[in-house]
Amino acid sequence: MRLPLPLLLLFGCRAILGSFGDRVSLSATAPTLDDEEKYASHMPTHLRCDACRAVAYQMGQHLAKAEAKSHTPDSSGSQELSESTYTDVLDRTCSQNWQSYGVQEVNQMKRLMGPGLSKGPEPSISVMITGGPWPNRLSMTCFHYLGEFGEDQIYEAYRQGHETLEALLCGGTHGSCSQEIPAQREEL
């Protein structure tokens, strides 16, 4: 008898928790999304820093994989990509499906979550909303940065390290992460 994965995980969690002798009650609720978060085609302002960091992470991961496959080391011995290669890699990065990202509520604040966005200890149980408008918003955000900075500048920043790439895309006086967004937004 084969059980579907969610049911298998539920039984596994119950078996683990039940084996400790004490009954532990866990509960989680999905974040409540406002109309902008549900329906707007753009990335909501309070999630732009997380989106930028996700884009920087994905660009770095894809460029690192491409360099590992490259067979042309530069003068320092590391793999340097040709302009056409890194341009193609960055374009494919932005065109990916972004399905591993979604919105989660952490400490009563909505955050974009996914690879490269972990900040401290994860809650013991949580619900993340994926799919919907989030993959398209992340793709549009990625292409926005390609247009704003260009592939050459992005690749040069990547070659100097992840922190430099993230600072280029997300930092600066007008960058998405330049100021802390208040946890509670005023309703109009």
Swiss-Prot record:
Per UniProt, subcellular location reads as: Endoplasmic reticulum lumen; Secreted
Keywords attached to this Swiss-Prot or TrEMBL record, sorted alphabetically, are:
Disulfide bond, Endoplasmic reticulum, Secreted, Signal
Per the record, the major location class is endoplasmic reticulum
Could you give a single Gene Ontology term from the biological process aspect? regulation of insulin receptor signaling pathway
UniProt xrefs under Pfam families: DUF3456 (PF11938)
Query: Disulfide connectivity?
Result: 49-177, 52-170, 94-142
Q: Does the keyword Transmembrane helix apply?
A: no
User: Which GO terms of the cellular component aspect does the record hold?
Assistant: endoplasmic reticulum chaperone complex; endoplasmic reticulum lumen; extracellular region
Q: Could you describe the post-translational modifications of this protein? A: Forms an interchain disulfide bond with IgM monomers.
Which first-to-last residue range defines the signal peptide? 1-21
Is the Secreted keyword given for this protein? Answer: yes
Motif residue range(s): Prevents secretion from ER:
185-188
The cross-references to InterPro entries, in alphabetical order and at most eight, read: DUF3456, MZB1
Q: Which family does it belong to?
A: Belongs to the MZB1 family.
Give the protein's biological function: Associates with immunoglobulin M (IgM) heavy and light chains and promotes IgM assembly and secretion. May exert its effect by acting as a molecular chaperone or as an oxidoreductase as it displays a low level of oxidoreductase activity. Helps to diversify peripheral B-cell functions by regulating Ca(2+) stores, antibody secretion, and integrin activation. Acts as a hormone-regulated adipokine/pro-inflammatory cytokine that is implicated in causing chronic inflammation, affecting cellular expansion and blunting insulin response in adipocytes. May have a role in the onset of insulin resistance.
* Oligomeric and partner information: Part of the ER chaperone complex, a multi-protein complex in the endoplasmic reticulum containing a large number of molecular chaperones which associates with unassembled incompletely folded immunoglobulin heavy chains. Interacts with HSP90B1 and PDIA3 in a calcium-dependent manner.
- Please identify the protein, giving its name as recorded: Marginal zone B- and B1-cell-specific protein
Q: Which organism is it from?
A: Rattus norvegicus
